[in-house]
Amino acid sequence: MAHMNPTPVLEAGQDKTMVLNMGPQHPSTHGVLRLLLEIDGETIVRIMPDIGYLHTGIEKTCEAKFYQQVVPMTDRIDYLCPMTNNLAYVLAVEKLLGLEIPERAQWIRVLCNELTRINSHLVWLGTGAMDLGAMTVFLYCFREREELLKLFEAVAGQRMMTSYFRVGGVSLEPPLGWFDRVKKFADTFPSKMDEYEGLLTQNPIFVMRTKGVAKITKEDALALGASGPTLRGSGIDFDLRRDMPYSGYDKFKFNVPVKTEGDVYARYQCRIAELRESCKIVQQALAGMPEGSIKADAPKVVLPDREKMKTQMESLIYHFKIVTEGFTVPPGEVYSAIESPRGEMGYYIVSDGTAKPYRVHMRSPSFANLQMLPSMCTGQLLADVVAAIGSIDIVLGDCDR
């Protein structure tokens, strides 16, 4: 019986070329990515990505879950920015429900999302630099990342799979002193950025390995569905936080870094500048954090406070019904997209009026950005494939789902 999804085969051309397998177990593919490479000496003639090694069927699984039970599953898609995935999903459900989210909850979401963006970019910077031989940067980046993971653990109870956002707001009020800890991090982070840039930006070896390497034109980037720093590194000035604001982003002032060269170095510059801009947004959120509730006034959707459950029978009944039966969502369909660290993260949800989604589809930036690889790498040297993969910052859980 024929296999439903046969393994891709790349045949060698004339006797000058040969075919190599890179991955799926390879440290520089940043996950279980397999690349079939046809090479002529050290030059890439053709490249074919082979994905699916991390496929979990998560979209289908969502159809068997209550709407609120899907939130922890979104953490596992792009595991380097779980709160970003949480936000994209809950915004879609809230749009179907027509919920109005309190301003404080929106600002906490923005604050946590920018901390998540910094966290994700630190992993990209540290691992991408190490792929090119810059070991010191990796150690510095993970020094700051550890502080961020401690902040996530303090506010959400988990270092990585946070599940902090809820349909209707956030799960808990940040603990006492948490905002002060975030402020301390944001105040010191620019000096840490200076350290990273001092090691890389003008480093002649790093510049030689990245400038003019793995170029992608803006026409190809648009045609293949690129987004995020991969798109902006090719000269397209587009950021969903600014151009289609959500969760109160229209109240924040920040710049969108854009470069026109389209090479690895341009994408590096975009993300480095983005780290600084995210830090500025964090500082603005801390300075202007509004008072008020962290949950929408929707007792049939949002779990009541535990204190109310102890004294109000109605709250206890609502809690029991939400946990055991879920909440129903009006029939309809919606697409909601946000700007994740890797680009446009979108959720398309179809509701049939029950407590479980009829269909959930995730538009993941890593899957779209991976399509750039053949255009980037054809004609490049074999060693430059590592730099190209690092520059598009893919996460295979985000690709395969």
UniProtKB/Swiss-Prot annotation:
The keyword rRNA-binding does not apply. GO terms for molecular function: NAD binding; NADH:ubiquinone reductase (non-electrogenic) activity; quinone binding. The keyword Protease does not apply. Keywords: Cell inner membrane, Cell membrane, Membrane, NAD, Quinone, Translocase, Transport, Ubiquinone. Its EC number is 7.1.1.-. NDH-1 is composed of 14 different subunits. Subunits NuoB, C, D, E, F, and G constitute the peripheral sector of the complex. Belongs to the complex I 49 kDa subunit family. PANTHER family: NADH DEHYDROGENASE [UBIQUINONE] IRON-SULFUR PROTEIN 2, MITOCHONDRIAL, NADH-UBIQUINONE OXIDOREDUCTASE 49 KDA SUBUNIT. This is NADH-quinone oxidoreductase subunit D 2. It comes from Koribacter versatilis (strain Ellin345). The lineage of its organism: Bacteria, Pseudomonadati, Acidobacteriota, Terriglobia, Terriglobales.
